[in-house]
Each structure stands twice: as C-alpha cells, then as structure tokens.
C-alpha cells in the first residue's frame, strides 16, 4: 500500500511517463544460469576442485525442489558457494513462483564482487546492487536502477545486513516500500556468521516471521555456520544443501596456520620480500601504508578502507 502510494504520486507528477523496468521472469534467469553452467555439470571427477564444486552445485539444483523453509549452505572456502547458492535460489523461486532473490551480505567488497558475477550471468538489468557505496547519479541509462533501489523492484537484489533489516524494522515510510518485494522471496544471508550478536534475537525473530507469514525461504550461507539453533524456534528444522560436508572440508583444506609469535616490523618486511605470492593483513591503516611504502614496486598492492571505493575496485581489478 505504501509503495503503491509512492508510485501513483510519481506517475501523476510525470504525466504517466514511467521509467521503471522490473527485469525478467525467474524462469528466464534460470535458463540463463543453466546455459552458463551447462558444461560444468559434465565434470564428475571428485578428485578435482572443479569436480567437487560441481557436486555441490548439482546438490543445490536438486534441493531447489524442496518446500519453502530454512536452509543451510555450509561450503568450505573455494567450494563455489556463490554460484551454488544462486542455482538453488533460482530453482527454488521457479518451483514456488517466487518473485525475488535477495542476497544479504555484511561487507560491501563482497557485495561488489558477487553483484558483478550475477550481472555477467543474468544480465545488467536483472541485478540491483544497493548499498552506501553505490551512486547511480543522474545518468539516464542508470535511472531505472536508481528508481528500483527505492523499492527493490528487480529480480535479484544484492544488499547489506543494515539495508535489509532497516527495511523491516525502520518506522519511515520510504523504507517500508521494500517489504512487499521481500515477501515471496528467497533471502540468502551470505557470511551468516557475521550477523551482529547484539541484534541476533530480533534478526532471527524477523527471519521466522518472514518464513511463517510472508512465503519466504531463508538460506544461511557460510563456511562456518554460527550456533543459531538455540535462537530459532525449537521446532524449526533446516535442510543442509551441501552434500558430504565433512568430506568437502577435508578436500578443500589448503591452509596450515603457524604462529610466529611477535616479530619485528623489519623482519616482516624481509619475510614478505622472500615470498613469490603473499597476503599481509595488519591491524591498522597506518601500518598497512607503511608496509606498502617499504615494499612498493611491481606486483605490490595496497588496499585499505581509507581509499575511495572506486580506487579499491581499480586496485582489485589489477
């Protein structure tokens, strides 16, 4: 009702000249995905990384036929959960005539990466990226996206935890416009372990409300599932989408941690210089800047939240 009021006012003020487009149907998007992954599905070599990813992908496609409800996708890092979760969501949406897929992600850097992957598979006009770093500006070409960000009238939405829960808890009418497009959707919480602890109970209560009264399915998608069972209703059951979880984690285990204790700054620099490929994460922006200045040269990059988002994108592209 709130969104209809806004849309009617907009239509009147613009003499019925509406610039909004809702994107393609879910069946069409599923067909796009199936064309993209068609050759992957032939790989059944479980001794290869791609074969393991295909096993998870196939399981998600099959699981899409399940009834609405709560799902977990516990996939180790490198297991292809971005495409696998999209495959489940599209199959599930087509099966139940659901209208939207909403990705809820804690970090804008992950949002930007995932949104780009989805655009490449599903087409630019079908994916809405909505967070504080997106500025559609006054571009006529991007006007439909700017308008869609007001009420999430696109088939696939990629957004933040803050944007999603504010749309449900805020008392402002402009935020309420999205609620009817959250209903009858598949909502995927990527990196679900990052849900803020101090707000966990109301967030879980809202998820249950969406499942019980808004024809919505919830997917908690992560490599490390948080212990949420005690917060959900005790009668609430979930379906795990990843096959043979323990086996997958053993296969994808490619990191060994070694505690070096406290080391001097100069020692760290010398250690980094001996490595062909290395990622160094430090506690402060200042320290990261100092390291970069000491190491700067071909193949050395500096990433920090003190940079503008466009600058970070440029560095990541390099």
Model-derived regions: residue spans:
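Conserved strand-helix element at the start of the C-terminal RecA-like helicase core
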Residues: 100-111, 271-296, 300-303
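Walker A/P-loop
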Residues: 67-89
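Conserved Walker A/P-loop ATP-binding site and its immediately adjacent core
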Residues: 90, 97-121, 134, 227, ...
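N-terminal accessory nucleic-acid engagement/regulatory domains that precede
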Residues: 1-42
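Inter-Walker segment of RecA-like/P-loop motor cores
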Residues: 123-169
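Interdomain hinge/linker at the junction between the two RecA-like core domains of SF2 helicases
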Residues: 213, 217, 221-274
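Conserved helicase motor
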Residues: 108, 128-142, 283-286, 301-317
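SF2 helicase catalytic motif II
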Residues: 162-165, 173-213, 218
